[in-house]
Swiss-Prot record:
The helix-turn-helix (HTH) motif in the cytoplasmic domain of the N-terminus is involved in the formation of spirals to maintain the rigid rod shape. As this protein is anchored in the cytoplasmic membrane, the HTH motif may contribute to protein-protein interactions to form the RodZ helix, which is localized beneath the cytoplasmic membrane. The C-terminal domain may be critical for determination of the rod shape by probably interacting with enzymes required for synthesis of the peptidoglycan layer, including PBPs in the periplasm. It is a single-pass type II membrane protein. It is found in: Cell inner membrane. One of its GO terms (cellular component) is plasma membrane. One of its GO terms (molecular function) is DNA binding. Residues 30-49 bind DNA. Residues 165-205, 217-239 have a biased composition (Low complexity). One of its GO terms (biological process) is regulation of cell shape. Residues 19-71 form the HTH cro/C1-type domain. This is Cytoskeleton protein RodZ. SMART domains: HTH_XRE (SM00530). Keywords: Cell inner membrane, Cell membrane, Cell shape, DNA-binding, Membrane, Signal-anchor, Transmembrane, Transmembrane helix. Belongs to the RodZ family.
Length: 335
Protein backbone atom coordinates (compact mmCIF):
# COMPACT_ATOMS: atom_id res chain seq x y z
CA UNK A 1 0.00 0.00 0.00
CA UNK A 2 2.79 2.45 0.85
CA UNK A 3 4.73 1.51 -2.30
CA UNK A 4 1.75 2.29 -4.53
CA UNK A 5 1.20 5.61 -2.75
CA UNK A 6 4.85 6.54 -3.23
CA UNK A 7 4.66 5.60 -6.93
CA UNK A 8 1.55 7.71 -7.44
CA UNK A 9 3.18 10.62 -5.61
CA UNK A 10 6.27 10.40 -7.86
CA UNK A 11 4.08 10.41 -10.95
CA UNK A 12 2.31 13.53 -9.66
CA UNK A 13 5.63 15.37 -9.30
CA UNK A 14 7.19 16.99 -12.35
CA UNK A 15 10.64 16.15 -13.63
CA UNK A 16 12.17 19.27 -12.13
CA UNK A 17 10.58 18.69 -8.73
CA UNK A 18 11.80 15.09 -8.61
CA UNK A 19 15.34 16.17 -9.45
CA UNK A 20 15.24 18.90 -6.79
CA UNK A 21 13.97 16.49 -4.10
CA UNK A 22 16.65 13.94 -4.95
CA UNK A 23 19.32 16.63 -4.80
CA UNK A 24 18.13 17.83 -1.41
CA UNK A 25 18.10 14.27 -0.10
CA UNK A 26 21.74 13.90 -1.12
CA UNK A 27 22.58 17.24 0.50
CA UNK A 28 23.81 18.85 -2.70
CA UNK A 29 23.38 22.48 -3.61
CA UNK A 30 22.61 23.90 -7.04
CA UNK A 31 26.17 25.25 -7.23
CA UNK A 32 27.62 21.77 -6.59
CA UNK A 33 25.39 20.21 -9.26
CA UNK A 34 26.33 22.93 -11.75
CA UNK A 35 30.05 22.38 -11.13
CA UNK A 36 29.76 18.58 -11.54
CA UNK A 37 27.72 18.82 -14.74
CA UNK A 38 29.77 21.79 -16.05
CA UNK A 39 26.62 23.87 -16.38
CA UNK A 40 25.56 27.31 -15.31
CA UNK A 41 23.65 27.68 -12.03
CA UNK A 42 20.87 29.40 -13.97
CA UNK A 43 20.53 26.34 -16.23
CA UNK A 44 20.22 24.01 -13.19
CA UNK A 45 17.60 26.35 -11.71
CA UNK A 46 15.59 26.38 -14.97
CA UNK A 47 15.64 22.56 -15.11
CA UNK A 48 14.32 22.28 -11.52
CA UNK A 49 11.59 24.83 -12.27
CA UNK A 50 10.59 22.95 -15.46
CA UNK A 51 11.55 25.88 -17.67
CA UNK A 52 12.97 25.46 -21.15
CA UNK A 53 15.49 28.22 -21.94
CA UNK A 54 14.74 29.92 -25.22
CA UNK A 55 18.36 29.89 -26.33
CA UNK A 56 18.81 26.17 -25.59
CA UNK A 57 17.85 23.44 -28.06
CA UNK A 58 15.58 20.65 -26.85
CA UNK A 59 18.21 18.02 -27.61
CA UNK A 60 20.72 19.68 -25.28
CA UNK A 61 18.04 20.15 -22.61
CA UNK A 62 17.15 16.44 -22.63
CA UNK A 63 20.81 15.54 -22.32
CA UNK A 64 21.25 17.87 -19.32
CA UNK A 65 18.21 16.31 -17.61
CA UNK A 66 19.55 12.76 -18.11
CA UNK A 67 22.93 13.76 -16.68
CA UNK A 68 21.21 15.40 -13.69
CA UNK A 69 19.13 12.22 -13.12
CA UNK A 70 22.22 9.99 -13.16
CA UNK A 71 23.90 12.33 -10.66
CA UNK A 72 21.04 12.08 -8.15
CA UNK A 73 20.44 8.30 -8.80
CA UNK A 74 17.06 8.53 -10.56
CA UNK A 75 16.36 5.99 -13.33
CA UNK A 76 15.95 7.57 -16.76
CA UNK A 77 12.85 5.43 -17.49
CA UNK A 78 10.94 7.18 -14.70
CA UNK A 79 11.71 10.60 -16.18
CA UNK A 80 10.86 9.64 -19.78
CA UNK A 81 7.19 10.77 -19.67
CA UNK A 82 8.19 14.10 -18.16
CA UNK A 83 10.87 14.62 -20.77
CA UNK A 84 8.35 14.29 -23.59
CA UNK A 85 6.32 17.11 -22.03
CA UNK A 86 9.12 19.38 -20.87
CA UNK A 87 11.52 19.04 -23.84
CA UNK A 88 9.68 17.61 -26.82
CA UNK A 89 11.72 16.84 -29.90
CA UNK A 90 11.19 19.36 -32.66
CA UNK A 91 11.67 18.56 -36.29
CA UNK A 92 14.70 20.29 -37.63
CA UNK A 93 14.06 22.83 -40.33
CA UNK A 94 15.94 21.79 -43.40
CA UNK A 95 16.44 24.42 -46.04
CA UNK A 96 15.28 23.30 -49.45
CA UNK A 97 18.09 22.34 -51.75
CA UNK A 98 18.77 24.70 -54.57
CA UNK A 99 18.51 23.49 -58.06
CA UNK A 100 21.76 22.63 -59.79
CA UNK A 101 20.79 24.71 -62.78
CA UNK A 102 20.17 27.74 -60.54
CA UNK A 103 23.63 27.45 -59.00
CA UNK A 104 25.17 27.01 -62.41
CA UNK A 105 23.36 30.09 -63.71
CA UNK A 106 24.53 32.15 -60.73
CA UNK A 107 28.10 30.92 -61.16
CA UNK A 108 27.99 31.86 -64.84
CA UNK A 109 26.72 35.33 -63.96
CA UNK A 110 29.48 35.77 -61.39
CA UNK A 111 32.02 34.69 -64.00
CA UNK A 112 30.80 37.33 -66.48
CA UNK A 113 30.90 39.97 -63.76
CA UNK A 114 34.47 39.05 -62.83
CA UNK A 115 35.52 39.08 -66.50
CA UNK A 116 34.00 42.53 -67.01
CA UNK A 117 35.75 43.82 -63.87
CA UNK A 118 39.14 42.57 -65.07
CA UNK A 119 38.51 44.03 -68.52
CA UNK A 120 37.76 47.47 -67.06
CA UNK A 121 40.87 47.21 -64.88
CA UNK A 122 43.08 46.34 -67.87
CA UNK A 123 41.61 49.23 -69.89
CA UNK A 124 42.32 51.70 -67.09
CA UNK A 125 45.90 50.43 -66.71
CA UNK A 126 46.44 50.58 -70.48
CA UNK A 127 45.12 54.14 -70.75
CA UNK A 128 47.29 55.25 -67.85
CA UNK A 129 50.37 53.69 -69.43
CA UNK A 130 49.59 55.25 -72.83
CA UNK A 131 49.12 58.67 -71.26
CA UNK A 132 52.42 58.39 -69.39
CA UNK A 133 54.26 57.25 -72.51
CA UNK A 134 52.87 60.12 -74.61
CA UNK A 135 53.86 62.66 -71.98
CA UNK A 136 57.34 61.16 -71.67
CA UNK A 137 57.77 61.06 -75.45
CA UNK A 138 56.63 64.69 -75.79
CA UNK A 139 59.21 65.78 -73.21
CA UNK A 140 61.96 63.85 -75.00
CA UNK A 141 61.00 65.38 -78.35
CA UNK A 142 60.98 68.84 -76.82
CA UNK A 143 64.46 68.35 -75.34
CA UNK A 144 65.72 67.03 -78.70
CA UNK A 145 64.24 70.04 -80.51
CA UNK A 146 65.89 72.41 -78.04
CA UNK A 147 69.25 70.69 -78.51
CA UNK A 148 68.94 70.90 -82.32
CA UNK A 149 68.08 74.60 -82.14
CA UNK A 150 71.05 75.28 -79.88
CA UNK A 151 73.38 73.37 -82.24
CA UNK A 152 72.10 75.33 -85.23
CA UNK A 153 72.58 78.63 -83.41
CA UNK A 154 76.12 77.66 -82.38
CA UNK A 155 76.96 76.78 -85.99
CA UNK A 156 75.58 80.13 -87.19
CA UNK A 157 77.61 82.00 -84.60
CA UNK A 158 80.79 80.18 -85.62
CA UNK A 159 80.19 80.88 -89.33
CA UNK A 160 79.62 84.56 -88.62
CA UNK A 161 82.79 84.87 -86.51
CA UNK A 162 85.16 83.89 -89.41
CA UNK A 163 84.82 87.16 -91.43
CA UNK A 164 85.33 89.16 -88.27
CA UNK A 165 88.66 87.44 -87.62
CA UNK A 166 89.78 88.00 -91.25
CA UNK A 167 88.95 91.69 -91.18
CA UNK A 168 90.76 92.07 -87.90
CA UNK A 169 93.87 90.44 -89.37
CA UNK A 170 93.62 92.66 -92.46
CA UNK A 171 93.35 95.79 -90.34
CA UNK A 172 96.40 94.78 -88.37
CA UNK A 173 98.34 94.15 -91.58
CA UNK A 174 97.32 97.51 -93.04
CA UNK A 175 98.29 99.28 -89.84
CA UNK A 176 101.77 97.79 -89.81
CA UNK A 177 102.75 97.88 -93.53
CA UNK A 178 103.23 101.69 -93.91
CA UNK A 179 106.43 101.52 -91.86
CA UNK A 180 108.44 100.20 -94.83
CA UNK A 181 107.95 103.29 -97.08
CA UNK A 182 109.00 105.52 -94.23
CA UNK A 183 112.30 103.67 -93.89
CA UNK A 184 112.86 103.80 -97.65
CA UNK A 185 112.24 107.54 -97.81
CA UNK A 186 114.64 108.14 -94.99
CA UNK A 187 117.32 106.17 -96.81
CA UNK A 188 116.77 108.09 -100.01
CA UNK A 189 117.12 111.44 -98.26
CA UNK A 190 120.49 110.41 -96.82
CA UNK A 191 122.02 109.71 -100.35
CA UNK A 192 120.73 112.45 -102.68
CA UNK A 193 123.89 112.48 -104.93
CA UNK A 194 123.48 108.96 -106.20
CA UNK A 195 121.63 108.89 -109.49
CA UNK A 196 120.96 105.57 -110.99
CA UNK A 197 118.41 104.31 -113.40
CA UNK A 198 115.34 102.89 -111.77
CA UNK A 199 115.38 99.14 -111.70
CA UNK A 200 112.78 97.25 -113.61
CA UNK A 201 109.70 96.65 -111.59
CA UNK A 202 108.90 93.05 -111.04
CA UNK A 203 105.20 92.33 -111.57
CA UNK A 204 105.25 90.10 -108.55
CA UNK A 205 106.27 93.04 -106.38
CA UNK A 206 103.21 95.05 -107.40
CA UNK A 207 100.91 92.16 -106.75
CA UNK A 208 98.54 92.52 -103.84
CA UNK A 209 99.78 90.63 -100.86
CA UNK A 210 97.11 88.58 -99.07
CA UNK A 211 96.28 89.74 -95.56
CA UNK A 212 97.66 86.58 -94.00
CA UNK A 213 101.05 86.95 -95.74
CA UNK A 214 101.19 90.66 -94.96
CA UNK A 215 100.63 89.87 -91.35
CA UNK A 216 103.40 87.26 -91.38
CA UNK A 217 105.91 89.54 -93.14
CA UNK A 218 105.19 92.45 -90.89
CA UNK A 219 105.59 90.31 -87.83
CA UNK A 220 108.91 88.98 -89.14
CA UNK A 221 110.27 92.48 -89.93
CA UNK A 222 111.88 94.06 -86.87
CA UNK A 223 110.20 97.12 -85.42
CA UNK A 224 111.56 100.49 -86.62
CA UNK A 225 113.90 102.45 -84.42
CA UNK A 226 112.75 105.29 -82.26
CA UNK A 227 114.24 107.83 -84.78
CA UNK A 228 111.44 107.03 -87.24
CA UNK A 229 108.91 108.71 -85.02
CA UNK A 230 108.72 112.47 -85.47
CA UNK A 231 109.97 114.51 -82.56
CA UNK A 232 106.70 116.36 -82.08
CA UNK A 233 104.50 113.26 -82.32
CA UNK A 234 102.79 112.15 -79.18
CA UNK A 235 102.72 108.49 -78.17
CA UNK A 236 99.62 106.57 -79.15
CA UNK A 237 97.13 105.99 -76.32
CA UNK A 238 96.88 102.44 -75.11
CA UNK A 239 93.67 100.51 -74.64
CA UNK A 240 94.33 100.07 -70.95
CA UNK A 241 94.17 103.81 -70.34
CA UNK A 242 90.47 103.88 -71.21
CA UNK A 243 89.48 100.70 -69.36
CA UNK A 244 86.99 101.29 -66.55
CA UNK A 245 85.56 98.76 -64.14
CA UNK A 246 81.87 98.26 -64.94
CA UNK A 247 79.37 98.51 -62.09
CA UNK A 248 77.80 95.28 -60.85
CA UNK A 249 74.22 94.91 -62.14
CA UNK A 250 71.78 94.08 -59.31
CA UNK A 251 69.72 92.03 -61.79
CA UNK A 252 72.67 89.85 -62.81
CA UNK A 253 71.88 86.16 -63.32
CA UNK A 254 74.61 83.71 -62.28
CA UNK A 255 74.45 80.00 -63.14
CA UNK A 256 76.82 77.18 -62.22
CA UNK A 257 76.54 73.81 -64.00
CA UNK A 258 77.30 70.44 -62.41
CA UNK A 259 76.53 68.47 -65.59
CA UNK A 260 75.81 69.06 -69.28
CA UNK A 261 72.59 71.05 -69.64
CA UNK A 262 70.65 72.78 -72.41
CA UNK A 263 69.54 76.31 -71.50
CA UNK A 264 67.64 79.26 -72.98
CA UNK A 265 67.38 82.67 -71.28
CA UNK A 266 65.26 85.59 -72.55
CA UNK A 267 64.88 89.02 -70.95
CA UNK A 268 61.85 91.33 -70.82
CA UNK A 269 62.57 92.81 -74.26
CA UNK A 270 62.42 89.38 -75.90
CA UNK A 271 66.18 89.27 -76.47
CA UNK A 272 67.79 85.87 -76.12
CA UNK A 273 70.64 86.33 -73.69
CA UNK A 274 71.73 82.71 -74.14
CA UNK A 275 70.49 79.65 -76.00
CA UNK A 276 72.60 76.54 -76.21
CA UNK A 277 74.38 73.76 -74.36
CA UNK A 278 76.46 74.36 -71.25
CA UNK A 279 79.06 71.81 -70.24
CA UNK A 280 79.87 70.41 -66.81
CA UNK A 281 81.67 72.76 -64.38
CA UNK A 282 80.75 75.74 -66.58
CA UNK A 283 79.74 79.19 -65.31
CA UNK A 284 77.40 81.67 -66.97
CA UNK A 285 76.82 85.32 -66.02
CA UNK A 286 73.97 87.11 -67.81
CA UNK A 287 72.72 90.67 -67.54
CA UNK A 288 69.55 92.05 -69.10
CA UNK A 289 66.24 93.64 -68.36
CA UNK A 290 64.13 91.77 -65.80
CA UNK A 291 62.03 89.70 -65.71
CA UNK A 292 63.97 86.78 -67.16
CA UNK A 293 62.31 83.78 -68.79
CA UNK A 294 64.28 80.56 -68.38
CA UNK A 295 63.89 77.21 -70.08
CA UNK A 296 66.14 74.49 -68.61
CA UNK A 297 66.41 70.98 -70.03
CA UNK A 298 67.99 69.39 -66.91
CA UNK A 299 67.09 71.39 -63.75
CA UNK A 300 69.16 69.07 -61.53
CA UNK A 301 72.35 70.04 -63.37
CA UNK A 302 72.23 73.82 -62.74
CA UNK A 303 72.40 76.11 -59.70
CA UNK A 304 70.94 79.58 -60.23
CA UNK A 305 71.57 82.76 -58.22
CA UNK A 306 69.50 85.85 -58.88
CA UNK A 307 70.04 89.12 -56.98
CA UNK A 308 72.58 87.23 -54.86
CA UNK A 309 70.05 84.63 -53.70
CA UNK A 310 69.65 80.99 -54.83
CA UNK A 311 66.61 80.04 -56.90
CA UNK A 312 64.66 76.95 -55.80
CA UNK A 313 64.27 74.35 -58.59
CA UNK A 314 63.27 71.41 -56.38
CA UNK A 315 59.74 71.13 -57.77
CA UNK A 316 61.11 70.59 -61.28
CA UNK A 317 63.78 68.16 -60.05
CA UNK A 318 61.19 65.98 -58.27
CA UNK A 319 58.99 65.68 -61.37
CA UNK A 320 62.01 65.24 -63.70
CA UNK A 321 60.66 67.59 -66.34
CA UNK A 322 61.83 70.58 -68.36
CA UNK A 323 61.86 73.70 -66.14
CA UNK A 324 60.04 76.79 -67.42
CA UNK A 325 60.12 79.68 -64.99
CA UNK A 326 60.16 83.46 -64.83
CA UNK A 327 62.40 85.48 -62.50
CA UNK A 328 60.95 88.92 -61.85
CA UNK A 329 62.48 91.86 -60.01
CA UNK A 330 61.31 90.53 -56.63
CA UNK A 331 62.93 87.09 -57.27
CA UNK A 332 59.66 85.16 -57.18
CA UNK A 333 60.06 82.36 -59.74
CA UNK A 334 56.82 81.43 -61.41
CA UNK A 335 56.16 78.60 -63.77
Amino acid sequence: MNTEATHDQNEALTTGARLRNAREQLGLSQQAVAERLCLKVSTVRDIEEDKAPADLASTFLRGYIRSYARLVHIPEEELQPGLEKQAPLRAAKVAPMQSFSLGKRRKKRDGWLMTFTWLVLFVVIGLSGAWWWQDHKAQQEEITTMADQSSAELNNNQSQSVPLDTSTTTDQAMATTPTSPVDTTATNTQTPAVTAPAPAVDPQQNAVVPPSQANVDTAATPAPAATTTPDGAAPLPTDQAGVTTPAVDPNALVMNFTADCWLEVTDATGKKLFSGMQRKDGNLNLTGQAPYKLKIGAPAAVQIQYQGKPVDLSRFIRTNQVARLTLNAEQSPAQ
